[in-house]
Amino acid sequence: MFAKTKIAVLAAVGLAHFTGAAQAETVLNVATAGSQNMVDYVKTYLAPKFEAMHPDVKVNVVGTGPGDAGSHKIMEKLSAQQQSGAETWDLDVAVVHQKIGGDMVKQGLLAKYRSDISTGKMVTRSTAENALGTDVNGYVMPMFHSQTAIAYNSDFISTPPASYDELVKWTQEHPKAFGYNGIKNGMSGVSFVAGWIYAYGTDAERLSSLPYDKGVEANWADAFANLKSFNKNVTFTPGNAGTLDMLNRGEIFMGPVWVDMFYSWKEQGKIPPSLKLALIAPGMPGQPMYYVAPKKTSHPELAREFIELATSPAIQAEGIVKRFNWYPGIDAEQVKSELDEATWNKLFAEITPDELAKFGKSFPIAPYFDDIKEGYERHVAN
């Protein structure tokens, strides 16, 4: 059906060198933002799988760089081609961060494809429809979800707090045994603070969707005052890794962490088996990476097939859950039958899929997020 096809996954070193592909071959360019482990995942795991299904396809893989900056390079490339009036664009599939995915939809850079792939119906979390206030329904498929949760030492805590209310009471009874990094040097602490505002200021649904109303922050005065009081009973950590280090050394017995980082450290023996996880009510934020298809891809069918494979239960189970300890982009129940019991229990026994769906929240949209961080600096840190 297809002529000899080459899929090139683009690099941070520059997207421009893909503009002059040889006319004799069909090139499907797939750009991936993210750190080196993301690039390696596409190169050493996804690419061979796709090549096995498409014998005439060759996959060459590099990335566009970590963080939103890597995603922004992809958006800049597509925006330039949009402005040039080109009939087709060089990129056919991209992996981008949540915020940039929303920005790309607003700029009209993406194709609506989710209803055209079989895995599109397997997505259940709201992040497939709302990207920090932008309606992205149909334009994105989550590659994975990262999530924050409360780690605790089960040797000393048999029943962890189930809510922010219970956590406040626990810290009053066990001063300095809970630790987090405030809003400095790591997003685990920022996530905890966002969850605090969801609990005591304005709920997550309102703060993670448009429209923005500057007046909403007037409702947070008590939340910030109570957080300042709460902080008198906690230990401040140096950052994401610092919280895990202090848990490992027994300097604290509870604190917010990234779930994937937690399990990776556990596998490496850097934290003891006695450390476990809980996701407290009314919830804490996490975020996805998205697979997207540019609006003027030359090869829409192959692009959809690539994303469909990447979001299939088998690939999500082996690649996303087992290799990286991420939560799957599709509904976890769709992945369960593809996982051995030990892997499922590791990732879902402590935080069940139901709890993840109920208490896994989005981060606030950018202006509310800024208001929360500025409010913390003004009313809590001082």
Model-based region annotation:
Residues 25-98:
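Early extracytoplasmic/lumenal segment of secretory-pathway proteins
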